[in-house]
Design a protein with these regions (language model features):
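Membrane-proximal helix-turn-helix segments that form the acceptor-binding/catalytic region
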Residues: 47-54, 77, 91, 102-122, ...
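Carbohydrate-associated surface elements
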Residues: 128, 147
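Nucleotide-sugar-dependent
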Residues: 183-189, 240-244, 252-271, 281-291
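Nucleotide-activated donor-binding/catalytic signature segment of Leloir-type glycosyltransferases, i.e.
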Residues: 216-243
Length: 373
């Protein structure tokens, strides 16, 4: 079999945000590229991916996310290929935030040691993550932001869908993503919105787009607060339909806790919200600080701020008072999405791959990972 230039190992399945990024970059690579996805358990996928790497003999292994399966696959192949890690997360800092077990934290520490320490290049999505890595002594770092398809993600006319869902002329606030839940913290994605509506009896409807175990908890929370009829769960939406469902939302939320993991972490939510012309309310953390005007930013105090829903409620009340202005201000944000255009982002990543391939240094040393990974 003819060796390929780049093999992308995606820590998710087809249709995922990580998969979309990998496919986009692969199309820009000068040479053959293969994209391989997760299918089962971490251990089984690591072994299967390693076999694929050995069979394809790529010059570069591109790990999409700093995660066990893709990094372990590279190591199980003997660490013979050049390795690029593309990540928007700081695993260890996040696990410390949610109070994960010592075993999980040790695994994350080992993963970061390999991913940051043995790779030829680390691509991060924001400058704050790059600054953290530089401070830790890792200087083979480039910043390439999250991407968005500006042709596909545009504001849509959704009057009929609003009527169908009982949202006609209602102020709507949306959150899109994977709805996790952290019992030790007492919340997860979207909890601040439910609390804001419930604590202050806001005449506002919440729209949650995505799936995950946190949705059931949000439903229970809304029912306990007496606002269950104001919470609407759209479920998982195909990327091709995402703009339609986001266009249901007058306002969108990007809530990041004020701690090292969140300053490092970026998501595709912000460019997606901007591309669809949604008004964004974000915490004053990370990339949002660099992009948005002060009117869009709220303070968040520490790693878990139980008073934040009250500040959010006041802001949402102000926005609901002049809904037409809020909608117009959201549409004006679309110009900010241009810097996240996927063609530009994919070309930047492809250029980074080319630079790694051009280096004259030898391949990374062989290594093995402990059974704990």
């Amino acid at each position: 079999m003819t060796p390929v230039g780049v093999q992308f190992l995606v820590n998710a399945g087809p249709g995922s945000a990580a998969g979309e990024r990998a496919e986009r970059i692969a199309r820009m690579v000068d040479g053959d590229a293969i994209v391989t996805y997760r299918k089962g358990t971490r251990r089984a996928d690591a072994v299967a991916m390693a076999r694929e790497v050995a069979r394809n003999a790529p010059e570069v292994v591109y790990a999409m996310d700093l995660a066990v399966a893709p990094v372990a696959a590279w190591a199980l192949d003997g660490g013979r290929r050049r390795l690029i890690v593309d990540t928007g997360d700081a695993p260890l800092a996040f696990l410390e935030l949610i109070g994960a077990s010592a075993t999980r934290r040790a695994m994350a520490r080992a993963l970061e040691s390999v991913g940051y320490g043995r790779s030829d290049l680390v691509i991060v999505r924001g400058r704050y993550h790059a600054e953290q890595l530089h401070a830790a002594g890792h200087h083979h770092v480039s910043v390439v932001a999250d991407g968005v398809d500006l042709d596909l993600l545009q504001p849509k006319e959704v009057t009929d869908l609003r009527t169908q869902l009982g949202l006609d002329r209602r102020m709507t606030v949306g959150v899109q993503g994977n709805f996790t839940w952290y019992p030790k913290l007492g919340g997860g994605l979207g909890w601040d919105l439910v609390q804001a509506i419930g604590r202050h009896d806001l005449d506002i409807d919440a729209v949650f787009i995505g799936e995950g175990p946190g949705l059931a908890q949000l439903r229970l929370m809304a029912e306990r607060l007496g606002v269950g009829d104001r919470v609407h769960m759209m479920g998982r939406v195909a990327y091709s339909q995402l703009a339609t469902y986001l266009s249901l939302c007058d306002v969108t939320l990007l809530t990041q806790t004020d701690d090292p993991s969140s300053w490092a972490r970026t998501t595709g939510k912000l460019p997606t919200y901007l591309a669809t012309g949604r008004y964004v309310v974000a915490t004053r953390v990370g990339t949002a600080v660099d992009l948005l005007e002060p009117e869009h930013l709220l303070d968040y105090r520490g790693h878990w701020d139980t008073t934040y829903p009250d500040r959010l409620a006041r802001k949402l009340g102000e926005l609901a008072h002049d809904r037409d202005r809020t909608i117009a201000r959201g549409l004006a944000l679309r110009s900010l999405a241009e810097s996240f255009d996927y063609d530009r982002i994919a070309r930047s990543c492809a250029s980074e791959i080319a630079r790694v391939c051009e280096r004259s240094a030898g391949s990374p040393a062989r290594l093995t990972l402990g059974a704990g990974l």
